[in-house]
């Protein structure tokens, strides 16, 4: 019997370790897996080039097109609409009629991953207005995971609603998972990295950055 990815054991080998603030020394690099650094580098309109570059690489789009079209939006989900406490997602933007959410996942509990599903569903219904015609927008939820699942060596994979034959039910709700430990492992094994993998390493690694960023005007 097939076991769903969410039901598998979590593998934290090669994950990035976060130092407590009290242990940080002058000159220490804070990796992107830190909530603080994620908001500084990605959820920050003054550093739009980084979020635009990341999204363009994940979705296979032209960087200039993404940069010119990307619009930052409020990342707090309205508690009155959902009869729940206010929930904040790490990053939300609009891009050519789509809503894109990005979550940086350090918490590898099943409950945390279930929340990721809930966030995307909430974004999907976020434009419903009582008494008016329903307007469901396309939502892409990108999860950058500081862990992987047992037996999963993939760098990135996409999930959507499909039947047992693999036919897609809708294109309006998709989940993209990226596994940082598998990128790190690929780098340590001296395998050639693509641009997305190099970017994510640049955000998190402390050493050999010049080799990773060489030739990329945005990363440099």
Task: Place the predicted regions along the sequence by residue.
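Elongated, amphipathic alpha-helical interaction scaffolds
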Residues: 1-220
């Amino acid at each position: 019997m097939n076991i769903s990815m969410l039901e598998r054991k979590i593998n934290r080998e090669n994950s990035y370790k976060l130092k407590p603030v009290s242990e940080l020394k002058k000159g220490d690099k804070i990796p992107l897996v830190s909530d603080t650094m994620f908001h500084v580098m990605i959820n920050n309109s003054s550093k739009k080039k980084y979020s635009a570059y990341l999204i363009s690489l994940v979705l296979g789009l032209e960087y200039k097109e993404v940069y010119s079209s990307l619009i930052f939006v409020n990342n707090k989900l309205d508690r009155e609409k959902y009869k729940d406490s206010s929930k904040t997602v790490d990053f939300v933007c609009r891009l050519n009629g789509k809503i894109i959410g990005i979550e940086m996942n350090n918490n590898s509990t099943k409950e945390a991953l279930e929340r990721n599903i809930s966030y995307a569903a909430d974004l999907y219904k976020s434009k419903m207005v009582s008494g008016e015609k329903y307007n469901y927008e396309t939502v892409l939820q990108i999860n950058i995971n500081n862990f992987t699942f047992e037996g999963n060596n993939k760098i990135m994979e996409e999930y959507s609603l499909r039947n047992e034959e693999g036919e897609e039910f809708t294109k309006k709700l998709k989940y993209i998972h990226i596994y940082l430990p598998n990128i790190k492992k690929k780098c340590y094994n001296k395998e050639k990295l693509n641009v997305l993998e190099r970017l994510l390493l640049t955000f998190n690694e402390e050493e050999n950055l010049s080799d990773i960023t060489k030739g990329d005007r945005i990363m440099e």
